[in-house]
């Protein structure tokens, strides 16, 4: 019997907790498919060191692990307090002062790093600090000072983020730091580049042009975290189509749109991304308690399982692996939860694009192969022989319980497919074509233990090997 694979991929964030090569190796063995470099933290040298460590271990283990560079973006923050933190009392007044020295904050006022904030707010706006833990109501704006009344108080420490309820902050999509980090990401050779806080599709177009100008070949991920980005379905689709993948970044997004709206928006984003043939990652606090505990809460287990059932390509861990005490255990638990959720039959039925026109021959072949696989009894696997990974992506848009094997001679392509739901990347290089190449692939998969004699498989390939966009054939073969 063909062995069962976990279909949902796991993205883990690198950090101090993963700097040990033994821990990193065990994380890969436990199920990590993509490692994230969070450019909001750490130095250029640290990121390069961690990326090299991942690459060397993955090469030794003969597995294809993708690297994801995550740009900080225009995160709007307060500056620093003289005493590092202050206590804000409800009904007291507090000033956000764009002219104040960045280190001279007090319990009465604090500086802000985004100097145009006074122009972006108006009376009665609600400003959310530290992910909404502190809430301020704007009562007046005078020049560069924003006068507020404290609605929800508490301890406020240095450099906490500022959001506006309902969105409306107009900071530019790429900062000077982001541009420096893009250069670092090129030196590292990341496969994916995540763009933070896009509000419209044009923001992604701008980010892509900038990255390409610097020489980046990375695929672009849109991090959905602004209220404007989910204002209506038209804007959602515009952002999805302008990117190669999206990340449902539930932290800032939940703060801006309100926690009560988050679950519905998550489901909408995942559904639309899959319908538009894009990859989708669900992120933020998925197993937050495992930063300090060896076991997750039941609510966290349900959250991960729900993201799987929604159809996420990947679920992501942040501080749980970057700075947590139990990075390996977290990966193991998340992997088990994903596999448990994938047993549910609800995710094995798909109507993907059944009523839509196909855009090209590759998509037509991929869709026909997957529908045949889901409706012909006895199919055990789908094999895509691919140059760019596009056919593998298309087949992975139709949910099924069947493994998809992406075979390519291009390491970059194999790393990209590491993020696709249900796809297992395998290196394959041959001068053969047609049925001869297909038979060689089958022999390789049997040798690797992925297939057994008697299995029925579907193979997609092109008549001409080695050229992008030439997939035009689907075969059903018996091993």
From Swiss-Prot:
ATP binds at residues 38-41, 77, 160. It comes from the Bacteria. Gene3D superfamilies: Phosphoenolpyruvate-binding domains, PK beta-barrel domain-like, Pyruvate kinase, C-terminal domain. It is an enzyme of class 2 (transferase). The record marks 223 as: Transition state stabilizer. Pathway: Carbohydrate degradation; glycolysis; pyruvate from D-glyceraldehyde 3-phosphate: step 5/5. Allosterically activated by AMP and by several sugar phosphates. Belongs to type II PK. Keywords: Allosteric enzyme, ATP-binding, Glycolysis, Kinase, Magnesium, Metal-binding, Nucleotide-binding, Potassium, Pyruvate, Transferase. Its EC number is 2.7.1.40. Substrate binds at residues 36, 251-252, 284. K(+) binds at residues 38, 40, 70. GO terms for molecular function: ATP binding; kinase activity; magnesium ion binding; potassium ion binding; pyruvate kinase activity. Its cofactor is Mg(2+); K(+). It catalyses: pyruvate + ATP = phosphoenolpyruvate + ADP + H(+). InterPro entries: Pyr_Knase, Pyrv/PenolPyrv_kinase-like_dom, Pyrv_kinase-like_dom_sf, Pyrv_Knase-like_insert_dom_sf, Pyrv_Knase_AS, Pyrv_Knase_brl, Pyrv_Knase_C, Pyrv_Knase_C_sf. Mg(2+) binds at residues 225, 252. Belongs to the pyruvate kinase family. Homotetramer. This is Pyruvate kinase. It comes from Buchnera aphidicola subsp. Baizongia pistaciae (strain Bp). The gene is pykA.
